[in-house]
């Protein structure tokens, strides 16, 4: 989260003319230290009900999951179900592989790649929308209950 907040602050400084009203919306628990310079541009909602989470994802440019240590990211799947693309850290094999395999997200290794990816989504809303749609299809094709159950049964050869 610290990387995301730091990168967002830098993005605001460098791109204030491009999209001056951009906000970072945080959902979930935990203490977050938000620098005074961007306090007005970061909205920390804390825990919210499921519909509010889906609504927030659906209204976002993208979902950013900067963790390098995810084993499986439910929030990425939820974002894809709302047809929004994702932005993930390239050093997280699981999330970057999901983004590549599904053609539903971009990945970054440093601030300048983060900025480039975010600008790509902003400058190409139709492509971002198509990527989000691909993400939804990826989730439905691979993680719906009947699909998971069939994979499990096939694995057990039942």
Name what the model sees in each region.
Residues 35-36, 77, 91-102, 107:
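Short acidic/histidine- and often glycine-rich active-site loop of Leloir-type glycosyltransferases
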Residues 85-89:
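Short hydrophobic beta-strand element within catalytic cores of glycosyltransferases
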Residues 19, 33-54:
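Nucleotide-activated donor-binding/catalytic signature segment of Leloir-type glycosyltransferases, i.e.
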Residues 120, 127-141, 151:
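A short, well-ordered alpha-helix in the C-terminal region of glycosyltransferases
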Residues 145-158:
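C-terminal alpha-helical cap of glycosyltransferases
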Residues 101-112, 120-125:
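Conserved acidic donor-binding segment of nucleotide-sugar-dependent glycosyltransferases
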Residues 68:
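Aromatic "clamp/platform" in nucleotide-sugar-dependent glycosyltransferases that forms part
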Residues 1-12:
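A conserved mid-protein helix/loop that constitutes part of the nucleotide-sugar donor-binding site
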């Amino acid at each position: 989260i610290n990387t995301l907040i730091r990168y967002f602050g830098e993005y605001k400084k460098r791109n204030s003319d491009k999209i001056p009203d951009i906000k970072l919306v945080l959902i979930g628990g935990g203490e977050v230290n938000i620098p005074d310079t961007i306090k007005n541009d970061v909205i920390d909602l804390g825990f919210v009900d499921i519909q509010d989470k889906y609504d927030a994802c659906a209204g976002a440019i993208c979902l950013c999951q900067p963790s390098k240590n995810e084993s499986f990211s439910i929030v990425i799947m939820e974002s894809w179900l709302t047809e929004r693309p994702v932005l993930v850290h390239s050093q997280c094999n699981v999330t970057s592989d999901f983004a590549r395999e599904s053609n539903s997200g971009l990945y970054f290794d440093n601030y300048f790649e983060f900025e480039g990816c975010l600008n790509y989504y902003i400058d190409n809303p139709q492509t971002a929308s198509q990527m989000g749609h691909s993400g939804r299809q990826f989730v439905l094709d691979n993680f719906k209950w009947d699909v998971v159950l069939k994979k499990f049964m096939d694995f057990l050869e039942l």
